[in-house]
Design a protein with these regions (language model features):
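Beta->alpha loop/short-helix hinge microenvironment recognizer with preference
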Residues: 1-383
Length: 383
C-alpha cells in the first residue's frame, strides 16, 4: 500500500474536523485546494501522440502555496531567480523567536502581529549593523516567517539570512571577516523591546482582538501582567553557523523559503482514527521519531499554519530592496571582485524546466516514445 499523503488525510478526516471546528474562509479554501489538487477539479490538459495516437491526460494542480504537491517547482524557480542576488561573501542565519505565552494573542491577531515580528527583527538588524560599534554599513538580508514546530504546534518565528558585510557611508565594502559581528545579547534586548513596544501600541489603540485561549487577555490587568512577564524573560535569538559561496547560500535558502507545516514524505501511515508522522526530537539531538495523533487533530494543526490572505512571507531588506538592489549589488560585486550568477530557468518554458530539474520529458509519449502534440483540448473545471 502506498504511503498516505496530506491530501489523503484531508479526504478522510476533514469532514470530521468540520463537526468539531469552524475554519476561517482562508483555511476552508486551503482545505478545498488540497483535496482537489490534481484530481480533475481544476481542469486538465489533453495531449495526443503524433505517432501512435495515445491520449495523455494531465490534471492541473491548485498552485497554492499551502499545498504540499505544489511547492517543488516554485521553490526551484524562486531559488534560481535569487542566484542573481547573492554574493561570494559570508552569510549568517539568525532565528528570532518569542515566548510561548504570547502565542494565543499572536494567533488571534495574525496579520498584525506577524507584521510586528518582521518589523522588530528588521529594524533590530538595520539599526545594529548601521552602528559603527558593530559594523557601520548597510547590509542585505531576507526574512522568512515560519509558524510551526516539528510537531505542527504553533511556534511563530522569523528566519533571517544575513549578508556578512555591506556598504559603508562612503560606498566601500565593509565586513568582519568570517566572524559574526552582532552581539546576541544586544540583539535579544533590542528585538524584545521593539516587539513588545509594538504589541503595547496596538493594544492601547484597541486594534487587538482576543479569541479562544486569548480571551483572558481582554482584561487590562491580565494583559499588563503578560507584558511584564515578557519583559522579564530573556529572548534569545539563535545564530547558526556561517556559510560561504553563492551556490551554498542558494541551497540553504531553499530549505526555508517554500516550506509548509508538514510535507508528504514525513507521513508514515494512517488508519481510521489516527495519523503517524515523523517529527524531530530536539531533546535527543534532533533524531527523527514517530508521533501519533488523531486525524482530526492533524487537520487542525495543519490549518493553524495557513497565513492570512495575500500575506507576504518572504521579505527583502537593505541592499536587497527592489528599488536599489541592482545598483547596490553591482557595486558590491565590483568591490569584492566576484561575478554575477545568472538565472538558468528564466528563459525556459515549463516543459524545459521540468526536464532540466527532474528529467521529466512532458512532450514524449509514454506509450511509444513519440512526440506529444500541444494540448488539443483543455477540459474545464469540474462542476
Amino acid at each position: 500500500m502506498d504511503k498516505p499523503t496530506v491530501q489523503d488525510i484531508f479526504h478522510r478526516f476533514y469532514p470530521a474536523y468540520l463537526d468539531q471546528y469552524s475554519p476561517s474562509p482562508v483555511q476552508a479554501n486551503v482545505a478545498h485546494n488540497i483535496m482537489n489538487c490534481k484530481t480533475g477539479a481544476y481542469g486538465a490538459n489533453v495531449c495526443v501522440c503524433e505517432d501512435c495516437g495515445f491520449v495523455q491526460i494531465h490534471y492541473n494542480s491548485c498552485r497554492k502555496r499551502c499545498c504540499p504537491m505544489c511547492q517543488a517547482v516554485p521553490k526551484e524557480m524562486w531559488m534560481d531567480a535569487r542566484r542573481e542576488d547573492v554574493l561570494d561573501a559570508p552569510y549568517f542565519h539568525l532565528v528570532f523567536t518569542v515566548p510561548d505565552i504570547l502565542n494565543p494573542v499572536i494567533y488571534s491577531n495574525q496579520r498584525l502581529l506577524y507584521d510586528a515580528l518582521y518589523h522588530a527583527a528588521s529594524s533590530t538588524i538595520s539599526e545594529l549593523t548601521a552602528d559603527p560599534k558593530h559594523l557601520g554599513a548597510k547590509v542585505g538580508y531576507i526574512c522568512i516567517l515560519h509558524t510551526w514546530g516539528s510537531e505542527m504546534n504553533f511556534h511563530p518565528h522569523i528566519h533571517t539570512i544575513l549578508l556578512g558585510g555591506g556598504l559603508a557611508s562612503n560606498n566601500q565594502w565593509k565586513d568582519n571577516g568570517e566572524n559574526f559581528f552582532l552581539p546576541i545579547r544586544v540583539i535579544s534586548k533590542m528585538f524584545r523591546g521593539k516587539y513588545l513596544e509594538e504589541l503595547k501600541r496596538l493594544w492601547e489603540e484597541d486594534k487587538l482582538v482576543f479569541h479562544g485561549t486569548a480571551e483572558k487577555f481582554r482584561n487590562h490587568y491580565t494583559f499588563k501582567e503578560l507584558l511584564d512577564s515578557c519583559y522579564g524573560m530573556d529572548w534569545i535569538p539563535h545564530c547558526k553557523k556561517t556559510f560561504n559561496g553563492a551556490q551554498t547560500v542558494i541551497k540553504y535558502l531553499g530549505k526555508y523559503t517554500h516550506r509548509i507545516a508538514v510535507s508528504n514524505h514525513r507521513i508514515v501511515r494512517m488508519d481510521d482514527d489516527t495519523v503517524i508522522f515523523l517529527v524531530k526530537d530536539y531533546r535527543n539531538e534532533g533524531q527523527w521519531k514517530e508521533l501519533t495523533i488523531s486525524g482530526v487533530e492533524f487537520v487542525r494543526r495543519f490549518l493553524m499554519h495557513v497565513p492570512p490572505r495575500r500575506f507576504v512571507r518572504i521579505r527583502h531588506y537593505g541592499l536587497l530592496c527592489s528599488r536599489t538592489k541592482s545598483q547596490k549589488l553591482t557595486l558590491c560585486r565590483n568591490l569584492l571582485g566576484c561575478k554575477k550568477y545568472l538565472s538558468k530557468l528564466r528563459d525556459m518554458e515549463m516543459p524545459e524546466i521540468l526536464e532540466h530539474l527532474y528529467g521529466i520529458k512532458v512532450c514524449v509519449c509514454k506509450a511509444c516514445g513519440g512526440h506529444l502534440g500541444k494540448p488539443q483540448m483543455r477540459m474545464p473545471l469540474r462542476c
